[in-house]
Amino acid sequence: MNEVTLQGYIRDIGFSHDIGNVEYGKANLICTGSNGKEDDIISLRFKKFSNRYNEGDLIEISGNLRSYSQKFENNKNKVEIYVFTYFDIPSILEKNKILLDGNICRMGKLNISKYGKKYIHFTLANNIFTPGGKKLNNYIPCTVYSELAEEIAEKYNVKDYIQICGDIHSHTYKKYMPDNSIEYRIAHEVVVKEYK
């Protein structure tokens, strides 16, 4: 299970890559943040021919959350999290909702934020199949807060199966480069609201 529904403004439409004769595009979707927080910037990938939208359009889409790991010459990995979509319109609109299942492949410890809120991070290994039958392994970073974080810390361990429902969130962080320059990057995670 890997189902995402989103509503937002499409921005920064451009070329991503090509495989064979198929061109893939990329864009950002600006989604209204929950609870009055800043907007979330969700990365999108899609087959270029499937995009019928223009810069700044308000759109509603469904798709699935994927991860892509890129290895560099210095043996460092960069994992990119994005939503792949065919621009199908969801039958039931949720402005930002994701359903996922899989096995926990990395589990953090229960922590307390500087604001006194309990939280825990874990990585979910999620497998999906493309329409062509290709199996994709995705590794999705997840965060849980408050009482829910305590429950998951007590009940679950690495390799355990879990189903979750939540939102996709983004945050900007600074990356210090070898030449002492600073690069601003966007990281994505699933904030878990329900589980079973």
Indicate where each model-derived feature is located.
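Single-stranded nucleic acid-binding surfaces, predominantly the OB-fold ssDNA-binding core
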Residues: M1-K196
